A protein has these predicted regions:
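Asparagine-centered strand-capping/turn motif at beta-strand->loop junctions
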Residues: 69-72, 86-90, 94-103, 260-268
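A short, hydrophobic C-terminal helix/tail in secreted or cell-surface proteins
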Residues: 354-373
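Cysteine-clustered segments with highest specificity for TGF-beta superfamily mature ligands
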Residues: 139-205
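Boundary/junction segments of secreted and surface-exposed precursor proteins
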Residues: 22-37, 226-238
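Beta-sandwich strand segments
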Residues: 121, 190-212, 328-340
Length: 381
């Protein structure tokens, strides 16, 4: 089980300042069974003497065991472990072409082998085990159970898939990935007595038992729920607004607050704010929000402020666009991107008219006064 930890500092994370947070993945396990697979490898030697066939490797066929892949529409894959628990059997038969009579008609054989089950670069391998057998005289011509020796083991274990290979196990929607099985380092030796024409060693390696239900393959997927950035703590709200109303020019800074929540819980991915863009870049508007990496865990809220400095008369508008991505460990598969939009507006007025406005007002007052005087003197206006 992975824990994705970070230190939450500052006063932004509501109720969690100065604490260590961790996103805890959810684990889902896929299981399957398969029929047994068998491979047969035959080595031979002509004439008296010893032959050793070292380090040969034969792949079992068919080799593929399908199992459900991780569906990236359900979350972010952050880890995986493969497990296997199956019986494996090595059977070795000695046989040969020998004369129908005479002495020294013996074939001695031996074989050492191991088996491997692999998934996405991770593998579990059995310990090597060996068997020996021989045939004598006419029994070499028609092999029987008396010329065959078997040894059984259990191939069992679990191992983690490298983060670099997680993408091999994931895809959008249902699908399958495959376990592979193989035989490794089959070291075989044949020793022929002097009256042997050709000696043979038949190595039979079986992965799994006759009962498919006992041949168990599984993969555990560790994943995080997607993050959910929102302007609300109760539901996903991706657009919001701040309205400063009408402010007096040079009347001093005005401040409004807003918050961003990562709706979720300890099983949710954190959020990284990768960039901030603005529609107008109006210099009268500023905010204390800045980009961050893994700065908002699931279920937490960050508080921010927007400041309006009314320096110029007229309407002020800007749209702040916040671009987020899921935060997850390197190699994770399925992270998403998100966007929040904050519309900010306000208006600035000046109660003292501009000089040009004063001129028109004075001209207007003068005209009104002149008309009034003419009327008082009995002259038409």
């Amino acid at each position: 089980m992975y824990k994705i930890a970070k230190f939450v500092s500052g006063m932004a994370a509501v109720g969690m300042a100065g604490s260590v947070m961790a996103a805890t993945p959810i684990t889902i396990t896929q299981n399957t069974t398969a029929s047994q697979f068998t491979t047969i490898q035959t080595q031979s030697r002509n004439g008296v003497g010893t032959s050793t066939f070292a380090g040969t490797s034969t792949v079992v066929g068919p080799t593929l065991v399908p199992i459900s892949r991780f569906d990236t529409t359900t979350g972010i894959l952050v880890g995986a472990r493969m497990s296997v628990n199956i019986p494996i059997t090595l059977a070795l038969t000695a046989r040969g072409n020998v004369p129908t009579s005479g002495n020294n008609r013996r074939v001695n054989v031996g074989s050492t082998v191991s088996g491997t089950v692999a998934l996405a670069g991770a593998s579990v391998t059995s310990t090597s085990f060996a068997v020996t057998e021989r045939c004598d005289n006419d029994a070499c011509l028609v092999p029987t159970a008396g010329n065959t020796t078997s040894s059984a083991r259990t191939l069992s274990g679990s191992t983690a898939v490298s983060a670099a290979n997680l993408a091999l196990l994931a895809g959008a929607g249902p699908g399958t990935v495959n376990f592979t099985t193989s035989v490794n380092a089959t070291n075989t030796q044949i020793v022929n007595r002097s009256n042997v024409i050709t000696g043979f060693a038949d190595t039979r390696f079986t992965v799994g038992g006759t009962t498919a239900a006992n041949n168990q393959y599984s993969v555990a997927y560790d994943y995080l729920n997607f993050a959910s950035p929102s302007f609300s703590t109760g539901s996903t709200v991706t657009s919001s607004s701040l309205n400063f109303g009408t402010l007096l020019i040079n009347g001093g800074l005005a401040t409004l607050n807003f918050s961003i929540t990562n709706i979720g819980n300890i099983n949710s991915a954190g959020l990284s704010l990768t960039s901030i863009s603005r529609s107008t870049n109006n210099s009268q508007l500023t905010s204390n929000i800045t980009t961050f990496s893994n700065g908002l865990d699931g279920g937490l809220t960050n508080n921010y402020s927007m400041t309006f400095d009314p320096l110029a008369v007229g309407a002020v508008n800007d749209i702040f666009t916040f671009n987020f991505i899921d935060f997850a460990p390197a190699g994770s598969v399925g992270a998403r991107s998100y966007q929040l939009n904050l519309a900010v507006s306000g208006n600035v007025f000046d109660p003292v008219p501009e000089p040009a406005s004063w001129m028109f007002m004075l001209l207007g007052f003068g005209l009104v006064g002149a008309v009034a005087r003419r009327r008082a003197a009995g002259q038409p206006g």
